[in-house]
Amino acid sequence: MTLPSKENFSEWYHEVIQTAEIMDVRYPVKGLYVWFPFGFKIRQLVYSKLREIMDREHDEVYFPALIPETELGKEGEHIKGFEDEVYWITHGGLTPLDVKLALRPTSETAMYPMFRLWVRNHADLPLKVYQIVNTFRYETKHTRPLIRLREITSFKEAHTVHKDFEEAAEHVKKAIGFYKEFYDFLAIPYMVIRRPEWDKFPGAAYTIAFDTIMPDGRTLQIGTVHHLADNFARTFDIKYEAPNGEHYYAHQTCYGISERCIAALISVHGDDLGLVLPFEVAPVQIVIIPILYKGKEEAVMEACRKLAEKLKAFRVVLDEGEDRPGAKYYKWELKGVPIRFEIGPRDAEKGVAVVSFRDEKRKFEVPLDEVDEGKVLEWARELKQRLRNAAAERMAEKVKFVENTGEIEEWGGVVAVYLCSDEDCGHSVEEHGKSLLGWFEEVPDWLDLEPEGKCVVCGREGRLAALAKTY
């Protein structure tokens, strides 16, 4: 079967998730999905990079999934942001519980009572930990795999504790750097945006978000970084003794990424044939397809096996199945395999293979004695750069700068405007059918716009902001 055109993005996305065996959507509970082995391998490869980045400065931990109602409700502003989405456990077997237990919607209220016990003295700071866990939200909106879920299966949340606001603010900048490195690794362009006051994380001093633009022009939030100031420290009594003997409330940050990063990977790079994966995160990096003719099978298979052996440092599949070559091409294109070799009888005789890359239509011959690990890694680097450039170009085409509010509603993608910090002006632009994502912390290099200008509403000094329909 062929996939729907990616121009019909919603239909394409649901079809590719199932057909390419990322997630099985047939689980009998709305908003819960099953990882196929192939999809889970992508998850492992993507998250191994995230772990590598986090492990440089953080220790990995694991906190329980059950949070007592007494703790969840302590930070009033925080729980207000989640209370209608919490799953509650009210019974242990048939016995009603004295205190209801929440299935974690996020882990601040699970972790911070323990941080109070761990942080006593300035020598305990900074504290930097992370975990990769599942979280639960009773989503009432339209659910879709990897994007809007009732069980987020792969939530990487980091939490840090610092001596003061300034040190925590410096760490926010570091966290932004971690996420930039991660998304650059995946060749996914992004916008780093400071959320409006009315859309920041409940209980935060401010929120910085990473947004990418999906093929239908809507934006997907793919990471957030929050400066919590001392708000949670006051609620959970997280204090430290300074060198002068005085006790002070700590300041905190938290930042998270979910499997939306994989939704972005699939959506940003994929095409009408299926997945297009960067080399590092492809479960199968190289496929070798023998083109067999009667009587010439042995020579072809010998050449294919030698090549597979030569490249065994990579994740290589020699497809010896009985399908015709065309069916094999279709299968491995759907799976996003970055590099394909074909060897037929004439190729084996000449000592060459025909090479093609998943992101390009062209094929070319290469002498088999020139194919080695170095050559493959060179191709992989070039492929990633092409993916990055193509994605940035497509994303830039979906952003339109406007100088009057009347144009906001007409544009199907992201609208860039200059906007002052006045809340009335912020709400005013939202009356035109799009949400205010916030203000660019930095203008991405793929967007050719100045960072400052006159507010589109009131004419005062403003900064570049983005409006969009969101997932």
Swiss-Prot record:
Natural source organism: Archaeoglobus fulgidus (strain ATCC 49558 / DSM 4304 / JCM 9628 / NBRC 100126 / VC-16)
Comment field on protein domains: Consists of three domains: the N-terminal catalytic domain, the anticodon-binding domain and the C-terminal extension.
Location (main, coarse): cytoplasm
NCBIfam families membership: proS_fam_I
GO cellular component, one term: aminoacyl-tRNA synthetase multienzyme complex
Catalysed reaction, written as an equation: tRNA(Pro) + L-proline + ATP = L-prolyl-tRNA(Pro) + AMP + diphosphate
HAMAP family tied to this protein: Pro_tRNA_synth_type3 (MF_01571)
PROSITE patterns attached to this UniProt entry: AA_TRNA_LIGASE_II
EC number of this enzyme: 6.1.1.15
UniProt subcellular location: Cytoplasm
Leading EC class: ligase
UniProt-recorded name of the protein: Proline--tRNA ligase
Alphabetized UniProt keyword annotations: Aminoacyl-tRNA synthetase, ATP-binding, Cytoplasm, Ligase, Nucleotide-binding, Protein biosynthesis
Keyword Electron transport: no
Family under the similarity heading: Belongs to the class-II aminoacyl-tRNA synthetase family. ProS type 3 subfamily.
Pfam families documented for this protein: HGTP_anticodon (PF03129), tRNA-synt_2b (PF00587)
GO MF annotations in UniProt: ATP binding; proline-tRNA ligase activity
Quaternary organization: Homodimer.
